[in-house]
């Protein structure tokens, strides 16, 4: 995957793989590569994780506990999906995680968080 770069206006899109409609979609979208390095966040994800700073280029395993990291590693190894609901600070969320592929091989993980 070439040339991931971040800009102040959050056009942190790798190639043309993320369509324009994802940028302002009313859910949080975070995408990482196969090593767990975050390569994309839409506007909602940037806002959701603002207190952690710019996450593009950081490893998502640094942001998860061991149990969650093990699930993510399994998804990356198997190309699988995972979905669950959580409640944090009285807010209910639905989380969907799925490996994404490039030329038939797992290239990373996409997480969609819906409130």
Language model: regions and residue ranges:
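Sensory modules in modular signal-transduction proteins
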Residues: 6-37, 41
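Feature targets compositionally biased, intrinsically disordered low-complexity regions
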Residues: 1-5, 14, 78-79, 89
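Short, low-complexity N-terminal regulatory "tails/caps" that precede and couple sensory modules
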Residues: 1-12, 106-110, 114-115
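Sensory/regulatory domains in signal-transduction proteins
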Residues: 44-115
């Amino acid at each position: 995957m070439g040339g991931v770069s971040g800009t102040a206006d959050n056009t942190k899109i790798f190639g043309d793989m993320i369509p324009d409609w994802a940028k302002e979609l009313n859910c949080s979208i975070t995408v990482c590569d196969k090593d767990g390095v975050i390569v994309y966040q839409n506007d909602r994800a940037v806002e959701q994780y603002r207190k952690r700073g710019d996450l593009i280029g950081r490893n998502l395993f640094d942001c998860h506990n061991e149990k969650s990291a093990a699930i993510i590693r399994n998804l990356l190894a198997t190309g699988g999906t995972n979905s669950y609901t959580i409640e944090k600070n009285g807010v209910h969320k639905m989380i969907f995680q799925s490996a994404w592929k490039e030329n038939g091989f797992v290239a990373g993980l996409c997480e969609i968080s819906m409130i």
